[in-house]
């Protein structure tokens, strides 16, 4: 096998607190927006919730021994803010801190590097009650929480991620309303975008100014956008190109630009102002504040699953006059096209468009309809094929000069898939939610072997 993954390449797997921990109200934990959102009827498929999830809170030792058997070099997980500050601020909950003490110690004992996401969507409900991420005050509440946790674990946790997928936090939570807190207001979503960026900068700045010996980055879900031009004899007009490009800026550059260049994409802001989706004063102050607070992160995390193919459609009811195309090909259970070339294209585009930065693929994986066969096994050959192709795209990107340092498969185990409840399985470990039994899928053994051969 071609040994072109660099020495020390971080092979990992990823999870998130709300999706696996369960124990939603145990040991002093406060209510999060996902607790509230899932307990309200009709928000989640089949009324599923994360009250128990994979019960990782009580079974983390078993889960860490599975990680060790897998041969993971690193494990990416998130801390539940509501376990540390049940109300989001004020009194610290010692039992919450002690849980993460035990988890982190267990990982380190087993030679697995903990990579910690500070915020993976489970905001304390008490903070949502005062506006959540749309309230500028939240920047300070987040800062206090983040610095408390970083200072407690800085000797054992060297890689920190401020936010997981700010795009989803802002637009799925505050515009489309399909994620907690379920708000549907584009202007509010833009306030959220800005709070997230300022919160990110504030933590990175404090870590650097106080010479804390850790690295801080952020994880963005990025989707390369392709213009549908394959229609016979069709000439793409300038307006089409521009609209598809603007839609890509909303998905990608709206976060990449401030994080790596210290400014929002101006063309996009102008368009939103013109469409009355953003106040012109607000657009000015957003640019100004990002410029003043900008600080370059230590690394960039990328979550990649698929691409988007779009074409111009003046009858579209979306923000831009475009619609999605679904090219012929292989799709996962999420209805996402399997397109490994997109990962390569994305990595090369970032390398060519932005200042140099170490990159980690912080999530990549696929949901398939996994079943336990009579022999008690899960034969997930499609997932193996998916991972193989994406690892290959990553390897090719490294050969082309991309500074890729690690790769985290989503996910270590099947878990609560947000609005889809438990209907979509992403794990390389199967979870029987009735019994909490863990079953290693074929992809577990494939990844175990792949790590061995590429370390």
UniProtKB/Swiss-Prot annotation:
Record-level GO BP terms: cellulose catabolic process
InterPro entries: Glyco_hydro_1, Glyco_hydro_1_AS, Glyco_hydro_1_beta-glucosidase, Glyco_hydro_1_N_CS, Glycoside_hydrolase_SF
Enzyme Commission no: 3.2.1.21
Gene3D superfamilies in alphabetical order: Glycosidases
GO cellular component: cytosol
SUPFAM superfamilies, per database record: (Trans)glycosidases (SSF51445)
Top-level EC class as recorded in UniProt: hydrolase
Chain coiled-coil ranges: none
The organism's place on the tree of life at top rank: Bacteria
Record field: catalytic activity: Hydrolysis of terminal, non-reducing beta-D-glucosyl residues with release of beta-D-glucose
Residue positions of the active site: 165 (proton donor), 363 (nucleophile)
Keywords: Carbohydrate metabolism, Cellulose degradation, Glycosidase, Hydrolase, Polysaccharide degradation
One of the record's GO molecular function terms: beta-glucosidase activity
Pfam families per UniProt: Glyco_hydro_1
Record's keyword annotation contains Ubl conjugation: no
Note in the entry: C.saccharolyticum is an extreme thermophile and appears to be a Gram-positive anaerobic bacterium.
Family classification: Belongs to the glycosyl hydrolase 1 family.
Protein known as: Beta-glucosidase A
Source organism per UniProt: Caldicellulosiruptor saccharolyticus
